[in-house]
């Protein structure tokens, strides 16, 4: 008697199909770094299970669905939704974080039914995070697909003609310096540039994309991009994390760091405590003052960075919210290290932040 196993709300099991290939076990242990799937019993009594039959605590857990060769592990939200040959397949890029994982979006009529990974060895390899895979679940919930206009203190449905006419009327009634605009975190470059051109047309400079104040020198592009490639992490021989938790902020980036740690034994250091990252690291300090010590060669890490051939320093967006964050980009010590300056990598939370820095702060 083969019983179905509980693996959480994302993974549906049908263990009568299982051939004990242990692909899911190896993925959980080697790639995800969360060894929660394993085999118990011997011979004909062998079973694949999560031991305590609880939900997998991994942000990459649903990749076992793609790995399973026989359909013993399938997507629970997608079950009985559609047949593969009924779906229109569109290649796209993930916008749930700033990594840019390559994905395939499967749609039935106008509904997004599922999101699958596309192979790209330079970015996400063949994996995607659970956030990426199941972000489509909320696309049809409370969706704003028509404009609303406030009338008598209540928002009422309108149409685009009425909304645009009202907008033009309001713009004409006020001075340009009284008009402000804000752009979202998931806007694409074409629309962002169009929005800026609109404000240039009405002669207003009150355009913003940041919800919080960032202390950052945006005059040079290298200060707000991830300078080395994602796969370049594998060639690094020292990694320093400053104010970032890559496991939750950028799951695929964290998977690359883990790969470098497991395969190349790369030493990893952190300023701040990011929590469980699925690999070992050493916390140098939990204060940004440590950056000043590194610059002045007063830290144990200074010589290690200078002597490393391919060091990488990954800076989290949260650091830029601190007033001391602006000094990170003035670190002359890092500029002397080979290769010059581009060892500093800024990871921004949202996909549109880099676009917005390039367009609005120039």
What label would you give each PLM region?
Residues 2-3, 8-13, 84-86:
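Membrane-interfacial loop-to-helix junctions in multi-pass inner-membrane proteins
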Residues 1-7, 42, 139-149:
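Residues forming anionic-ligand binding surfaces in small-molecule and nucleic-acid pockets
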Residues 37, 73-74:
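Short hydrophobic beta-strand motif reused across regulatory alpha/beta modules
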Residues 1-5, 35-49, 214-216:
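Short, conserved phosphate-binding/catalytic loop or strand-edge motifs used
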Residues 7, 18-21, 30, 35-39:
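Hydrophobic alpha-helical bundles that form the membrane domains of multi-pass transporters
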Residues 14-15, 21, 25-26, 32, ...:
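Catalytic alpha/large subunits of respiratory electron-transfer oxidoreductases
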Residues 339-340:
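Cationic, amphipathic, low-complexity segments that mediate targeting or membrane/lipid association
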């Amino acid at each position: 008697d083969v019983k179905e196993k509980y693996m959480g709300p994302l993974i549906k099991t049908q263990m009568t199909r299982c051939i004990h290939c242990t692909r899911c076990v190896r993925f959980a242990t080697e790639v995800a770094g969360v060894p929660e799937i394993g085999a118990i019993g011997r011979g004909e009594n062998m079973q694949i299970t999560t031991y305590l039959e609880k939900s997998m605590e991994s942000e990459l857990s649903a990749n076992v669905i793609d790995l399973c060769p026989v359909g013993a592990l399938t997507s629970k939200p997608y079950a009985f939704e559609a047949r593969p040959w009924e779906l229109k397949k569109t290649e796209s890029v993930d916008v749930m974080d700033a990594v840019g994982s390559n994905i395939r979006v499967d749609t039935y009529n106008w509904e997004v039914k599922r999101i699958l990974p596309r192979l790209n060895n330079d970015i996400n390899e063949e994996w995607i995070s659970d956030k990426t895979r199941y972000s489509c679940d909320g696309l049809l919930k409370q969706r704003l697909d028509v404009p609303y206009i406030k009338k008598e203190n209540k928002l009422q449905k309108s149409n685009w003609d009425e909304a645009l006419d009202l907008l033009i009327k309001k713009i004409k009634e006020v001075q340009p310096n009284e008009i402000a605009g804000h752009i979202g975190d998931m806007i694409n470059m074409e629309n962002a540039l169009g929005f800026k051109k609109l404000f240039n047309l009405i002669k207003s400079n009150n355009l913003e994309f940041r919800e919080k104040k960032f202390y950052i020198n945006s005059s040079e592009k290298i200060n707000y991009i991830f300078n080395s490639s994602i796969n370049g992490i594998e060639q690094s021989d020292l990694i320093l994390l400053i104010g970032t938790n890559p496991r939750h902020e950028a799951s695929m980036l964290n998977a690359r760091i883990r790969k470098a740690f497991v395969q190349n034994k790369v030493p990893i250091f952190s300023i701040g405590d990011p929590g469980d990252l699925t690999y070992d690291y050493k916390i140098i300090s939990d204060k940004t003052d440590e950056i000043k010590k590194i610059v002045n060669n007063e830290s144990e890490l200074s010589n290690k960075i200078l002597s490393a051939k391919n060091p990488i320093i990954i800076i989290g967006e949260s650091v830029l919210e601190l007033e001391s964050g602006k000094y990170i980009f003035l670190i002359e010590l890092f500029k002397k290290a080979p290769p010059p300056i581009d060892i500093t990598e800024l990871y921004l939370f949202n996909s549109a932040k880099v676009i917005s820095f390039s367009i609005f702060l120039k």
